[in-house]
Amino acid sequence: VGTMICDGKNWILAFIVGILIGVIVGCINGFGVAIMKAPSLIFTLGVNGILRGLMFIYTDGADVNNIPKSFKDISAKALPGVRLTYYFIGALILTIIIHLILTNTRKGRYVKAVGDNADGAKLVGINPVATKFVSYIICSVMASIAGILFCSRIGIVTTSSGNGYEMTAVAACVLGGISLTGGVGSVIGSAIGAVIMSSISYLLVFMGFSSDYNDAITGSILIVIVVVDSVMQIRSRMKLRHERLQARTRDD
């Protein structure tokens, strides 16, 4: 998108191309994970590596740094009288819409059901393969939109842009209450987790720490939360098992 805009192409065309690339990537991820049953983390990281290689080839390793100011203003302009940028307002509205879809529509609830127990969801008539496939497409489209806004906000795109963001995204989701095993959490919680992670980064800069600390702190937060989540799941399973044993004892 950045190279097309810098080359004078129509913005709408550039946006459409960016979204279509997201759809294609989502289809690839959905095919690999939902249909071929490949491990989601390994497969998506592999696709990420391929895309970074293709980006390097497409740009010939050069930075995209002559992005027009008018495009950068998209993420900088704010509503008159308030200090809220259109960038923030758009993200907030999109978060609320997706949250409402996932919690108040049948298809949205299917996503959580498949994440919680794919086999159980299949027994009640939900197609887990189709649900996962579509979910990967939607996630990739959201990532495309985020990439376009990142380009507008930063004003420069390098071959290393976005490196490490996947770990930050995972940490934000887990911090917001998303379970790595699926079926638990909400979009609102993930958004709050993202705000907290961003606040930590800004706080480090404000305190005079180098940005090199970001990855270490993000990794530490992720490890702590995952360990706590695992302990809570183990305790929950043990409690459920204990209740079942008590019920059987009473029946006997």
What are these regions (language model features)?
Residues 19, 48, 52-53, 88-100, ...:
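Hydrophobic core segments of alpha-helical transmembrane domains in multi-pass membrane transport
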Residues 143, 153-219:
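Transmembrane alpha-helical segments in multi-pass inner-membrane proteins
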Residues 36, 40-104, 131-134, 153-162, ...:
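Transmembrane helix-bundle core of multi-pass membrane transporters
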Residues 119, 123-130, 204-252:
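Cytosolic-side transmembrane-helix boundaries in multi-pass membrane proteins
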Residues 8-9, 35-37, 104, 130, ...:
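Helix-loop interface residues and adjacent transmembrane-helix termini in multi-pass membrane transporters
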Residues 4, 23, 27-35, 54, ...:
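Membrane-interface helix caps of multi-pass small-molecule transporters
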Residues 10-18, 24-29, 33, 80-158:
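Helix-loop-helix "hairpin" substructures at the membrane interface of multi-pass membrane proteins
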Residues 14-22, 40-48, 132-140, 160-169, ...:
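Alpha-helical transmembrane segments of multi-pass membrane proteins, especially transporters
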